[in-house]
Regions:
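N-terminal interaction/assembly modules
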Residues: 1-119, 123-134
Length: 134
């Protein structure tokens, strides 16, 4: 498993916990990084993702609302919503990763943490996001 994949997985765990708590993001990141024995590179990239998603959540949710036909954000499974936020951040704001790579990584995370059906769901929404960006 590559460093970026590990970092996305770490960011997902951190953002998942933060979704339903008022905990300090940096403390949660340090906790999960230590628990998973993440390297400094992995923790650094995960931190960038976490901070980017938090800082841009309103914009990310707006993009997701506009591209997730027939699905309100609050109806989505929590893990799917967070996977989508990370991907939309990478595709529309960060832009350091090729869109296809961000989508493929997100599909894999969704399948791992939410199931096969979630992978198809995430793929469909991110396909629309990517089409709206290019």
């Amino acid at each position: 498993m590559g460093k970026r994949h590990q970092a996305r997985e770490l960011a997902l765990k951190v953002l998942f916990q933060l979704e339903s708590s008022e905990d300090d993001p940096e403390e949660v990141l340090r906790y999960h990084a230590a628990e998973g024995a993440a390297t400094s590179d992995v923790a650094h990239f995960a931190g960038q993702l976490v901070r980017g998603v938090i800082a841009n959540q309103e914009k990310l949710d707006g993009i997701l609302s506009a591209t997730s036909e027939h699905w309100k954000l609050e109806q989505m499974a929590k893990v799917d919503r967070i996977v989508l936020r990370i991907a939309v951040y990478e595709i529309t704001i960060d832009r350091h990763v090729p869109t296809k790579a961000a989508i493929n990584e997100s599909i894999e995370l969704a399948k791992t943490f939410s199931g096969e059906e979630a992978g198809r769901f995430v793929n469909g929404i991110l396909g629309r996001v990517a089409a709206s960006v290019t």
